[in-house]
């Protein structure tokens, strides 16, 4: 029995990146042998074992054979006759098909180290085309390593296009598509993920809304907010926002807010042809189709619904601001204020760029400080005054409105906080 370190740990070592997890492959063993050594078996499709002390994953060397459709239509042979090279051959990319033995020697039958040095994402074998999920994985890896200068090999991109042409992507579950997309959103350059999918024609299958935007070869002008949109600008914006925030819900909210607005602009008049309620209804359906988690959906819908209000919030009445806090349940979900502030400030700053004005004309911290002022109002004095029932709520609202009014009238403090 021999044990080898494989996969991402070796790849990241060559790239001088942090090693998150270490995966091991065991050659010449059986499940019974590992169980006798106190390993714990997990996994459904094929046996994976957790080390009794380190809890790192150990997998038996295996080969797979295509017997169905999608990324789950495989049978596995993990007998003790399977060799290390056979196991490495089934992996997606050459940079992930490198092993290291106990003496520190590298086993690299598919020239993965060379591809790491040359910054190339290359498939290991023609079997790459058997798993449609790998199309999304390669796009994600391209986004993950974009800052290092990685590119997809021409022959690999051709295979990805063939997989798409054969409608293999239709066999992927919505949940699995979202998991890969979520990981892509978590990279430093999530926009690259969508660009790769566009290049191999997968975007029209996975994200038809985004692909439709690509098909619009013109600038869209949103008269309501005086924004200029095109596909390049949207993804340039996503790239810039990703430098500001790593929150997936913030990144997702921005991307799909821009895209949805583009889809509902009349090209002849450049006017939004859908009202806010219809836009939110459409957005909810889109989130359901993509299996978007609730925490992302809530932020996205809230921003889409209240963007017009937020973009000029410093002109809104104190009463309307307090009512807005109640509508979004900010008292119990104060994190919404932070996320909406990031989104709103970013969009306003981009509007300022297109209108050639300075961002100093907009109170970037207004939303955050207004909420802090209102949130400091305590309910205890209200109770001591003998209020009960709905009277408590109404008095609390009144005091919060007055607090914001007094804060706004103090010009010195107001300007110091907001600008």
UniProtKB/Swiss-Prot annotation:
Natural source organism: Buchnera aphidicola subsp. Baizongia pistaciae (strain Bp)
Binding locations of CTP: 8, 11, 91, 137, 140
Protein name: CCA-adding enzyme
Family statement: Belongs to the tRNA nucleotidyltransferase/poly(A) polymerase family. Bacterial CCA-adding enzyme type 2 subfamily.
GO MF annotation terms: ATP binding; CCA tRNA nucleotidyltransferase activity; magnesium ion binding; tRNA binding
A Pfam family the protein falls into: PolyA_pol_RNAbd
Keywords annotated in UniProt: ATP-binding, Magnesium, Metal-binding, Nucleotide-binding, Nucleotidyltransferase, RNA repair, RNA-binding, Transferase, tRNA processing
EC number: 2.7.7.72
């Amino acid at each position: 029995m021999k044990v080898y370190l494989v996969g991402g740990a070796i790849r990241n070592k060559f790239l001088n990146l942090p090693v998150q997890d270490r995966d091991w492959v065991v050659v010449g063993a059986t499940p019974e042998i590992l169980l006798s050594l106190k390993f714990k078996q997990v996994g459904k499709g094929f046996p994976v074992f957790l080390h009794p002390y380190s809890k790192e994953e150990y997998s038996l060397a295996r080969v797979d054979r295509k017997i169905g459709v999608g990324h789950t239509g495989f049978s596995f042979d993990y007998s003790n006759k399977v060799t290390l090279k056979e196991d490495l051959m089934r992996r997606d990319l050459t940079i992930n098909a490198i092993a290291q033995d106990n003496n520190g020697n590298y086993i690299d039958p598919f020239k993965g180290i060379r591809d790491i040095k040359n910054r190339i994402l290359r498939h290991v074998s023609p079997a790459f085309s058997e798993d449609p999920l790998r199309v999304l994985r390669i796009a994600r890896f391209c986004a993950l390593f974009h800052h290092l200068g990685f590119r997809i090999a021409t022959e690999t991109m051709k295979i990805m296009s063939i997989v798409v042409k054969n409608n293999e992507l239709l066999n992927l579950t919505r949940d699995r598509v979202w998991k890969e997309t979520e990981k892509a959103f978590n990279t430093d350059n999530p926009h690259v993920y969508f660009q790769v999918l566009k290049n191999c024609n997968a975007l029209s299958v996975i994200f038809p809304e985004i692909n439709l935007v690509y098909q619009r070869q013109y600038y869209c002008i949103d008269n309501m907010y005086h924004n200029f949109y095109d596909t390049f600008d949207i993804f340039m914006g996503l790239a810039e926002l990703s430098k500001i925030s790593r929150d997936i819900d913030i990144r997702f909210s921005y991307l799909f807010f821009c895209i949805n607005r583009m889809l509902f602009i009349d090209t002849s008049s450049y006017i939004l042809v859908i009202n806010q309620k219809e836009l939110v209804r459409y957005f909810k359906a889109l989130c359901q189709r993509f299996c978007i988690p609730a925490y992302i959906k809530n932020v996205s819908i809230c921003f889409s619904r209240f963007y017009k209000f937020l973009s000029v919030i410093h002109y809104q009445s104190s009463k309307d601001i307090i009512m807005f806090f109640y509508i979004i349940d900010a008292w119990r979900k104060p994190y919404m204020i932070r996320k909406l502030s990031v989104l709103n400030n970013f969009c306003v700053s981009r509007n300022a760029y297109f209108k050639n004005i300075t961002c100093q004309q907009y109170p970037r911290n207004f939303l955050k400080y207004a909420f802090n002022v209102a949130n400091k109002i305590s309910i205890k004095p209200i109770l001591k005054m003998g209020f009960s029932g709905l009277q408590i709520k109404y008095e609390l609202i009144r005091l919060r409105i007055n607090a914001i009014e007094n804060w706004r009238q103090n010009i010195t403090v107001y300007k110091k906080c907001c600008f």
